[in-house]
């Protein structure tokens, strides 16, 4: 990349008056490949020098035709850039080499060859940084114009992403270069940020920069062909009159000064003029030759992104002044303010920014800033990534290191101009000025935050001197986010955000956008973006139609599959039914045949026996019966009893006796169905329909998310349900990146691709200042999605959760983020209020234990020794009471734990009655459950109670060393903990209970001096925290426990006479309070408290050996005496039961 350096404008000795020459120097950077470009004094002459002195040199040719005999051109020893042979020999350039006449005069006047379709045309577009133009018909092909990123012939990149000014274009200098404008100012029509080139009104000239000679040697300058007063031609730059003109010289060793060019035409006026008006100015500063050059912006050139005046050089720049295109944005693409000619009689001053140029004299001057790298030289530029001001040598060293090679720099002059333009008050500008020497992070913001530096409105004075009356910045700057032209500024945003066409489409809220610069350019950019969005809507509509057709097709397929599956199973059941019926028939027939055969045999034997018996009876009754006849009767009877007629010895096994006494079959025939209805349950759950999450039926779990703490990770739980209202079996698929693109057949534009959803579930959190907060999604079981974010400021945040682009139930909603509680301040200040004293009257307490705050903000206290429950307002004023001593419903015997559920019902552990009672919010008895015993559902001194969001009741069964869970109606659900003396007690006399936000149950293990956490999914697994002691995180007889609105765990460390605070996520110790205030803090013990209860001095009612209780860990600043329970009100107040002092402390 080259830097054009005008040094001076003066008369040349010995030359006639009129033509003047501009001495130029070029500061050249070495590319990454190691090929350094030669400057004056280089030893590489030979071919390069003969090439510049050839007869086809444009300089030589031009001077012979127009200037006649003039001074010989200087000697040049190389070109600034090298053109690859593949580019010279490309198919689109080969036909043009035959017109070897220089300046492109041999090419037809009004035609060029399209690089895509190879057709000749007169109007085209320069979409890339090479010379290969594209006709408008090829360029406007949709959507290919959005997909092209590099030239198909040479690989050059797009002009929109180049590190070069959009008003100046360097093409490869070919013997016959392409026609069309090689320059364009901000009024040039653009299409998708590409230069729209057309045939110029006057003869164009291709040009390149080539250098040689010693620094300061004269160089030929091509001027515009203008008639002089003598009627001849004179050579001078456009905008420089015949009178003496000069440039103020600047040296890095001198003080910063304001550079100016006298009598130069104003910038910013007459936008309707030809876009070629600046060409003559650059032509006058350029040396024309036919040396092939290559754009520094091509992919083969990896020069750094930095201002031209910061290009690497062996030493401090030798030139006396530098003209660097001022950059209008933080992006690395420099932009040049354009000058349009005005009347030659106009005498104006054009201030040119110098590298160390300060603000105008009206602004407060800034002293030299020391380099933050070497700390020995004056700073020259500011690294946007390192956030450091560096000198020129440190900048060069920055570019030699691979890790910092691609860092972007901004000159301090431009940086200060931008900061001053942002400053609303002089004090703020002074602060910015001071921050540059130290840390400008606060002034600049983080790199990549989307802020765009706009140097066009440095100050009102400078705008008046530069512009032509326009008060708004020029629209030639580029958006640092989308690399698109800035077209407007938001009037509603706090910092007047600069917007490109893409930013306007993505800008949140209905803000008013004021166009900048040429309104035609702004409208054109918005039209281009609108056309892209229109095309996107059309493609999305086509996709919706495809999805609708897919839904209908998939529904039909699912119906057919359901019918087929059920028919298959029904057929199988029918076949089984037929088989079982056949088996029944077979068994029935067999059994019946056997029994019928046996019955027939028995009937035959019976007849035979009957006849034999009758014959024998008659013979026996007759007196004249001879012996022979009787013998025959005997044989007949014996034959009938023996059965078979066979003579085998064992043939009479089945004799008549056995036939008569035993039945050959039974009636056993029974159908056995599947056990426990397994098949029936499976049939009822047969199959499943997967349709994904439905926004209408999905919702946020609970409402605690509406209040969160600043600078603390906050988690929101979302319950996903399908279209039928059923829980999703898994939420993993809904939070994973989708594999189906929104446009299946077209590759979208880059910013449209970023706007596409990557999963079914999307969550957006907008902070009070309008910025987006990063949200992390984590899938859980049963369709639960955990959304976590980190609020950094206080205020009202907006939450919107989308399922497939549709807000879920209850969204969008607001969340109140506030500053977290400081427990160190609570410990230092002590209690803000104390109420209650020893006694049995209304508002008086006797050894209270449990406490809770209901949904109405009332404070409910279990007055244990008075066998009642008292209700107070938030300030401790007595409201009502209920309960008396006894064992009937509504009566108590030393009530202990107390809590409320979501229905605002009051749940009380009636300790010595070994039961739990439930009351409504007015104290009316509802139900009771439990009795003394060891079986499930029975208690042995229940102590603490807790309820969750489902109103399940957890009870600490102290003497049974377990915790039992019940339904809201008192039905037993499960237990945890050992209740046998033969096992080690993992819970030893549990006391306090509370449910954590994630559903886990937190228990104070009284005799083990620790905390236990049980998971609701597996009650047999338990985590324990803490041990016995008086250090932080250690306990002695812990009792009550509660969760505050910020998620902190508060534990009553009873015998240490304090309350300890822990983080719920990792049980990290945060602080403690409850001791007396620091001396001289202004706090005094409340006077209404009586002396310690003398009759009961031991802990928890044990016989006393002295008149006053003696704590286990005495403290000189003791305030609490064995705190037993605590509760947190909706306003954040902490109510602590001071057991030993028979009162309630409020913090």
Swiss-Prot record:
It comes from Caenorhabditis elegans. Residues 33-47, 84-93 have a biased composition (Low complexity). This is Protein lin-41. SMART domains: BBC, BBOX, IG_FLMN. It is found in: Cytoplasm; Cytoplasm, P-body. One of its GO terms (cellular component) is ribonucleoprotein granule. It comes from the Eukaryota. A zinc finger (RING-type) spans 114-155. Residues 565-618 form a coiled coil. Zn(2+) binds at residues 371, 374, 394, 398. Its main location: cytoplasm. The gene is lin-41. The keyword Methyltransferase does not apply. Belongs to the TRIM/RBCC family. Induction: Negatively regulated by the microRNA (miRNA) let-7 which causes degradation of the mRNA encoding this protein. This requires a let-7 complementary site (LCS) in the 3'-UTR of the mRNA encoding this protein. Filamin repeats lie at residues 723-817. Heterochronic protein which acts downstream of let-7 in temporal patterning. Plays a role in the developmental timing of postembryonic hypodermal seam cell division and fusion events and adult alae production. Represses lin-29 during late larval stages, which prevents terminal differentiation of hypodermal seam cells and promotes their division. Involved in post-transcriptional gene regulation, uses two independent pathways. Has direct and specific RNA-binding activity and, depending on the location (5'UTR or 3'UTR) of the target site, triggers either mRNA decay or repression of translation. The NHL domain, containing the 6 NHL repeats, is necessary and sufficient to target RNA but not to repress mRNA. The minimal region needed to execute repression consists of the coiled coil domain and the Filamin repeat. The RING-type domain is dispensable for mRNA repression.
């Amino acid at each position: 990349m080259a830097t054009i350096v005008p040094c001076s404008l003066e008369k040349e000795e010995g030359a006639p008056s009129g033509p003047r020459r501009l001495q130029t120097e070029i500061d050249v950077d070495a590319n990454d490949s190691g090929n350094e470009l030669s400057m004056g004094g280089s030893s590489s002459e030979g071919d390069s020098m003969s090439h510049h002195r050839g007869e086809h040199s444009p300089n030589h040719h031009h001077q012979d035709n127009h200037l006649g005999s003039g001074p010989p051109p200087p000697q040049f020893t190389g070109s600034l850039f090298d053109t690859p042979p593949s580019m010279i020999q490309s198919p689109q350039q080969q036909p043009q080499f035959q017109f070897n006449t220089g300046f492109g005069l041999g090419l037809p006047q009004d035609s060029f060859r399209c690089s895509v379709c190879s057709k000749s045309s007169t109007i085209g577009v320069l979409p890339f940084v090479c010379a290969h133009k594209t006709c408008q018909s090829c360029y406007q092909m949709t959507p290919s114009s959005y997909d092209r990123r590099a030239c198909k012939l040479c690989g050059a990149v797009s002009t929109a992403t180049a590190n070069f000014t959009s008003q100046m274009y360097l093409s490869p200098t070919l013997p016959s270069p392409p026609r069309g404008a090689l320059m364009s100012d901000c009024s040039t029509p653009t299409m998708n940020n590409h230069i729209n080139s057309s045939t110029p009104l006057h003869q164009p000239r291709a040009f390149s920069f080539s250098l040689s000679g010693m620094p300061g040697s004269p160089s030929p300058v091509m001027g515009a062909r203008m008639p002089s007063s003598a009627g001849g031609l004179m050579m001078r730059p456009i905008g420089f009159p015949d009178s003496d003109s000069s440039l103020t010289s600047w040296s890095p060793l001198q003080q910063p000064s304001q550079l100016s060019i006298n009598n130069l035409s104003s910038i910013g006026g007459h936008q309707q003029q030809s876009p070629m008006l600046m060409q003559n100015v650059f032509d006058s500063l350029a040396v024309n030759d036919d040396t092939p050059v290559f754009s520094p912006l091509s992919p083969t050139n990896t020069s750094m992104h930095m201002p031209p005046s910061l290009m690497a050089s062996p030493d401090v720049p030798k030139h006396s002044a530098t003209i660097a295109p001022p950059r209008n944005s933080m992006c690395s693409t420099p932009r040049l303010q354009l000058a349009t000619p005005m009347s030659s009689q106009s005498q104006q001053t054009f201030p040119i920014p110098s590298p160390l140029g300060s603000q105008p004299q009206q602004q407060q001057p800034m002293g030299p800033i020391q380099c933050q790298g070497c700390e020995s030289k004056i700073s020259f530029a500011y690294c946007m990534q390192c956030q450091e001001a560096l000198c020129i040598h440190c900048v060069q060293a920055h570019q030699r290191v691979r890790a910092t090679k691609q860092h972007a720099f901004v000159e301090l002059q431009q940086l200060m101009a931008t900061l001053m333009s942002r400053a609303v008050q002089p004090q703020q500008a002074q602060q910015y000025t001071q921050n540059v020497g130290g840390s400008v992070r606060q002034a600049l913001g983080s790199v990549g935050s989307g802020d765009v530096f706009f140097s066009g409105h440095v100050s009102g004075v400078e705008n008046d001197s530069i512009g032509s009356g326009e008060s708004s910045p020029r629209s030639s700057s580029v958006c640092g986010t989308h690399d698109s032209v800035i077209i407007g500024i938001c009037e509603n945003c706090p910092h007047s955000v600069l917007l490109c066409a893409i930013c306007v489409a993505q800008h949140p809220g209905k803000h008013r956008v004021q166009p900048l610069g040429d309104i035609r350019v702004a409208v054109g950019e918005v039209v281009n973006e609108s056309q892209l969005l229109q095309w996107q809507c059309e493609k999305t509509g086509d996709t919706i139609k495809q999805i609708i057709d897919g839904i209908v097709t998939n529904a039909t397929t699912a119906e057919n599959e359901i019918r087929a599956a059920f028919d298959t199973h029904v057929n199988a059941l029918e076949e089984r039914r037929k088989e079982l019926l056949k088996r029944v028939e077979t068994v029935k027939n067999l059994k019946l045949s056997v029994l019928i055969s046996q019955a027939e045999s028995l009937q035959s034997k019976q007849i035979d026996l009957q006849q034999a018996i009758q014959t024998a009876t008659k013979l026996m009754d007759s007196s004249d019966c001879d012996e022979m006849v009787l013998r025959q009767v005997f044989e007949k009877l014996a034959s009938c009893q023996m059965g078979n007629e066979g003579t085998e010895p064992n043939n009479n096994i089945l004799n008549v006796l056995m036939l008569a006494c035993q039945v050959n079959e039974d009636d056993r025939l029974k159908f056995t169905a599947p056990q426990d209805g397994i098949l029936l349950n499976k049939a009822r759950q047969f199959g499943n329909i997967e349709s994904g999450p439905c926004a209408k039926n999905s919702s946020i779990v609970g409402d605690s998310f509406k209040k969160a703490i600043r600078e603390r990770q906050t988690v929101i739980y979302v319950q996903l349900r399908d279209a039928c209202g059923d829980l999703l079996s898994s939420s993993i698929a809904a939070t994973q990146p989708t594999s189906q693109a929104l446009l299946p057949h077209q590759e979208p534009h880059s910013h449209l691709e970023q706007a596409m959803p990557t999963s079914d579930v999307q969550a957006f959190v907008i902070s009070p200042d309008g910025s987006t907060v990063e949200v992390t999604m984590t899938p859980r079981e049963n369709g639960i999605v955990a959304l976590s974010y980190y609020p950094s400021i206080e205020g009202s945040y907006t939450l919107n959760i989308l399922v497939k682009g549709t807000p879920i139930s209850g969204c969008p909603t607001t969340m109140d983020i506030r500053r977290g509680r400081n427990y160190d301040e609570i410990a230092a200040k002590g209690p803000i209020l104390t109420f209650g004293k020893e006694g049995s009257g209304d508002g008086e307490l006797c050894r209270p234990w449990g406490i809770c705050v209901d949904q109405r903000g009332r404070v409910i206290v279990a007055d244990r020794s008075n066998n009642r429950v008292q209700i107070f307002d938030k300030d401790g004023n007595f409201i009502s009471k209920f309960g008396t001593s006894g064992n009937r419903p509504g009566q108590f015997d030393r009530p202990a734990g107390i809590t409320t559920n979501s229905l605002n019902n009051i749940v009380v552990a009636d300790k010595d009655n070994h039961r739990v009672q439930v009351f409504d919010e007015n104290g009316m008895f509802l139900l009771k459950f439990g009795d003394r015993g060891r079986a499930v559902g029975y208690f042995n001194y229940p102590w603490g109670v807790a309820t969750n969001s489902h109103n399940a009741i957890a009870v600490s069964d102290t003497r049974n060393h377990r915790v039992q869970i019940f339904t809201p109606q008192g039905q037993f659900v499960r237990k945890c903990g050992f209740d046998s003396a033969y096992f080690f007690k993992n819970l030893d006399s549990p006391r306090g209970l509370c449910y954590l936000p994630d559903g886990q149950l937190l228990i104070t293990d009284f005799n083990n001096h620790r905390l236990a956490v049980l998971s609701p999914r597996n009650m047999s697994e338990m985590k324990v925290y803490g041990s016995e002691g008086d250090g932080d995180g250690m306990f002695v007889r812990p009792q009550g426990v509660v969760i505050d609105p910020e998620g902190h765990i508060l534990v009553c460390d009873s015998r240490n006479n304090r309350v300890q605070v822990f983080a719920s996520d990792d049980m990290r110790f945060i602080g403690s309070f409850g001791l007396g205030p620091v001396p001289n803090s202004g706090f005094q013990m409340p006077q209404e408290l009586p002396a310690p209860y003398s009759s009961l001095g031991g802990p928890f009612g044990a016989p006393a050996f002295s008149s006053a209780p003696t704590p286990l860990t005495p403290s000189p600043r003791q305030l609490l005496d064995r705190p037993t329970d605590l509760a947190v009100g909706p306003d954040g107040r902490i109510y602590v039961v001071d057991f030993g002092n028979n009162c309630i402390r409020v913090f």
